[in-house]
From Swiss-Prot:
Residues 33-53, 221-278 are annotated as: Disordered. Pfam families: Ribosomal_L2, Ribosomal_L2_C. This is Large ribosomal subunit protein uL2. One of its GO terms (biological process) is cytoplasmic translation. One of its GO terms (cellular component) is large ribosomal subunit. One of the primary rRNA binding proteins. Required for association of the 30S and 50S subunits to form the 70S ribosome, for tRNA binding and peptide bond formation. It has been suggested to have peptidyltransferase activity; this is somewhat controversial. Makes several contacts with the 16S rRNA in the 70S ribosome. Residues 269-278 have a biased composition (Basic residues). Part of the 50S ribosomal subunit. Forms a bridge to the 30S subunit in the 70S ribosome.
Amino acid sequence: MALKSYNPTSPARRGLVLVDKSALWKGKPVKALTEGKRKTGGRNNKGHVTSRGIAGGHKQKYRYVDFKRRKWDMPATVERLEYDPNRTAFIALVKYEDGELAYILAPQRLGVGDQVIAGEKTDVKPGNAMLLSQMPVGTIIHNVEMKPGKGGQIARSAGTYVQLVGRDRGMVIVRLNSGEQRYLRGDCMGTVGAVSNPDNGNQNLAKAGRNRWLGKRPLTRGVAKNPVDHPHGGGEGRTSGGRHPVTPWGKPTKGARTRHNKATDKMIIRSRHAKKKR
């Protein structure tokens, strides 16, 4: 999908650049594959704000997307490509030979009428899913499992992908978008291709209201607040905060490392932070 630029017929149209969705399905989703979705407004079950900057937004239905791809050796035909408000990628409605319908993440270069299949070993073509151990080295993949049977967790966002760069003792080595290289079990599943909608990050929404439609509220900078409200607040005139960036509760942010899962540290060959200055 290409980007679509709009003429400045009004202030809200000036600079507006959106992804062209003219090739997507214009009707409603399959009702059996959707469910209602209640908005939280960033509040927990006690009504306390636990995630700031979230409120409102257009009403959405949740689409059940098959991240597991465990219906093996059953060809499926792509019926249509659809917009999904719950994610940045597009989704594809596929119909299996036995008549079952399912939504899958749409990879780039997947079109209506194409056939996809999942299995232990399949052809290397966009939309086909197979075990990582059966893929050729160098394959571009997405929707990659970290635990066999759990469903894809890596590379599900618009335009993302993982590259399989090697094999080692029943494990495979993959390179992630962040630059991290890590081991994954060979019996995990992955889908061939990169995720659709790579231009998602190049959009210019052009007005605050469009972000509100997406359910995003404005976030006030800490340096614009008073000392009572934020560690960066206060000062005479405009200041830079005077310390390393922290959250309103004084925890380091913007680059501070938060990973504490020592059990899987041995699976990471090269950290995504390896390029940073010591």
